[in-house]
Amino acid sequence: MIRLAACQYAIELHETWEAYADHLQGLCAEAVEAGARLLLLPEYAGLVLSGQLSAEQRGDLKASIVGIQPLIEPWKALCESLARRWGIYLQPGSIPVLDRDGRYRNRAWLFGPKGVLGYQDKLMMTRFEREQWDIAAGQGLQVFDTELGRLGILICYDNEFPMLARRLAEGGADLILAPSCTDTEAGYHRVRIGAQARALENQIAVLQSPTVGLAPWSPALDENIGRAGLFVPPDHGMPGDGVVALSEESSPATSQWLVCEVDLEEVRRVRREGQVFTRRDWPEQFERIV
């Protein structure tokens, strides 16, 4: 049994590095004290670093991501130090990163007790990212080997595309981390429904962490709504609706952790002994439509 913590992350203004570092450390300490071994924050949680920029720069959609680039390495070092100190796995949400080709990508690093395990870029861009923000798509999917099991990361919109999760499942992932950032109930439910569908199709677990709250100082994070949740395939020994845990409200005033547990061996058992074999039978559908 693994104890996980997914954050409903309230977007707050932290105008100095010290204030931000204290905030992140204190927030993570709450989950660690609750016994969590893996902590998940949402998509674009790293963009909160833009609070340290001038009001003019943080209020400009493109200037804000330019301005945070010098803060990314200190931010990574902070996240790594927290993971090492507490012996945990930390996925601190995603952050826009200037890549080697001069394009910005939405990147999610994973940190563990021994340091940086790697990163996953978002692959499918929303209309906002494509049309207004010029965030570029990443390439390729990573499966991370950890002491807890094999993990994959699908950032927000990526959860709405079945073949991405399928590739992670084929690579051995038992748990997908789904950091998300949505500004409407419809947006939140698109990601959640996608996450639950991916859990059903691949007979794996999916953990979702959303942004919440209002941040009028940030044009990218101004409105946020969503619930944290842990989803599994509905089957023998699993919840009938596939929902292991779900936040009570979608717009809390402050950041809240959803601390929950999953037995990945029980999830694997469903793949062997379940009422249905959606994972095994996946290829058969393509034989039926030719």
Segments predicted by a language model, with ranges:
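Extreme N-terminal starter segment of soluble prokaryotic enzymes
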Residues: 1-6
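Short polar catalytic/cofactor-binding loops
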Residues: 8-15
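Cys-nucleophile CN-hydrolase/nitrilase-fold catalytic domain and related Cys-dependent amidase chemistry
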Residues: 17-113, 183-197, 202
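CN hydrolase (nitrilase-like) catalytic-core segments centered on the catalytic cysteine
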Residues: 71, 75-91, 160-254
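Short beta-strand scaffold segments in enzyme catalytic cores
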Residues: 92-93, 106-110, 142, 208, ...
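Active-site catalytic loop in hydrolytic enzyme cores
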Residues: 97-171, 184-197, 276, 282
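A short, polar/charged loop-to-alpha-helix boundary motif
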Residues: 122-135, 254-269
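A short C-terminal boundary segment appended to hydrolase-like catalytic domains
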Residues: 257-290
